[in-house]
């Protein structure tokens, strides 16, 4: 079959890698590079070279089993790393790192700080109650993180110096926007990544040489089928297949894989026919 793949992030590249074995694929990428969130920068410091990842950085053995198998098949090496969370607030002077007790109480005055100790109690309470509420289906789809924190009367130190900045760091959002984040997705993500547990946590890993190291071997078998700077403008579906409109013109394909964000896919999709609406 002739298959169009829209997007060259990990979803698009893996789809192309697997489908290219038996089908004629064409991968469309609107930007001038492939890899999606994969972005590695070379930095020299004190005579040493470092590959710094600024997009996709880490993965773990709990939630990335297929990605780990893919790296093994490609012969791409990875190594274990540590994940920790640090806060420095110049306004309040609060500073800590959650890696161990010594770094948690790096400011020794926090050993006797009611607000800091209250934050630690709130962390344990949130971990316990959020998991329970998720399991008992007491978190509605319309409840936000801010709603839940207000309803649970969590302290300002916990809100401002732990849960909100941690979420903002993970999803690259402002602190204000983080409060409007859907709670159900938030808790499920934290649970799946071991962030609601003090002891039982996954092993985090990084790709040796930076995350870019997997892109070349992954695309080696179909690199000539990749079109850079070639955004898809429109996708039309009919009973016999799909038509794509791009800078290359109108082209027919048997199937299309939307490996882009959902809002982008909906923009491209022509849902003005019965068959289109049924598939949307």
Model-identified regions with their sequence ranges:
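Helical element adjacent to the flavin cofactor pocket in flavoenzyme catalytic cores
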Residues: 188-246
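Glycine-rich FAD pyrophosphate-binding loop
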Residues: 20-44
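Mobile amphipathic helical/loop "lid" adjacent to a hydrophobic cofactor/ligand pocket
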Residues: 61-183, 187-188
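N-terminal Rossmann-like FAD-binding beta1-loop-alpha1 element of flavoenzymes
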Residues: 2-27
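Flavin (primarily FAD) binding-site architecture
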Residues: 258-273
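Conserved small/polar residues in nucleotide/adenosyl-binding loops
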Residues: 275-280
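N-terminal glycine-rich dinucleotide-binding loop that anchors FAD/FMN and/or NAD(P) in oxidoreductases
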Residues: 41-67
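Core beta-strand elements of the Rossmann-like FAD/NAD(P) dinucleotide-binding domain
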Residues: 247-255
